[in-house]
Amino acid sequence: MSNYLEQVQSLTSSKTSNGVAWGGINPEYAARMRLQNRFLTGLDIARYTASIMRADMQNYDGDTSQYTQSLGCWHGFTAQQMLMAIKRHKHTTNRSYVYLSGWMVAALRSDFGPLPDQSMHEKTAVSGLIEEIYTFLKQADARELRHLFVELDETRAAGGDVDAVLDKIDNFQTHIVPIIADIDAGFGNEEATYLLAKKMIEAGACCIQIENQVSDAKQCGHQDGKVTVPHEDFLAKINAVRYAFIELGVDDGVIVARTDSLGAGLTQKIPVSQEPGDLASQYNAFLKTEPVTDATSLGEGDMVFKQNDELVKPHRLPNGLYAFRDGSGEDRVCLTVSPASKTARICFGLKPKSLISIRSQAW
């Protein structure tokens, strides 16, 4: 039996069992409303789209011609019209995503007006936009399904091929597609990152993109003056996002870990190393330093630390930031972690076309 007819039959039984209270209810109308509102919450959307994105990632790993396209949208209406146009042209929404960049949100969605891409816009601007986009996409579903319901009524009245119309309804493809949502650098520490990630997931995001810049000194990825955080800080924020996904029951949610290390020449702090080769030691190895052979050469407030059995002084700018060695950016893109005797080398995405997903199991 058609799924549509099963819904009608089920609601007809419910009407009978509810007696007078449902006396004015038309079971077929109710079935249509349910089909038009398939996704009741943002979490329903996040779980549904996460499974799509994971399948697409697996397909791409097996065949790189099966790539996806993520098109930027700054309003629910533009997303709606974009997906309706894609579906009309391609007869499918497969491998078509919506991309919400922090740059775009800062420029077009802040109550403060157009802003540079420096995390100065409201924290909830992205989660609000996610909810808005999915509201418009659900509206597109309701609109197209209504046309099919009208076609069904007209076909019945004319004695036409009802089964053909029922097949269209049963195989209707939703306009709900995955959204890749940019959380910038998390808008604060790992706790702030976790709280904001929850808001974004609850709004429907199955994929969150995060970068390794200092949150309160964040710059657009195409600008100079970028300041990165130590590896431990970035991994803590990635895990915070993973915890948010797990808590909300979106276990296969995707995290896009993006680095600005290639173009960033500064760090705000020097992490404390506990043993040679740990994450802090790896990070500090890229600092621009000079050997210290005589304590009298140190100035007021200078700091030194031990590196490879010698004392070195990191190069500190007048603003208190520390510089990395010239040409070390490409090496800083990757790091090695060794949790419980397992070693994993992680290379973070440099730019949109090379973004990779990082799962919490990797560390």
Question: Where are the regions a protein language model picked out?
Answer:
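Alpha/beta enzyme core
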Residues: 2-363
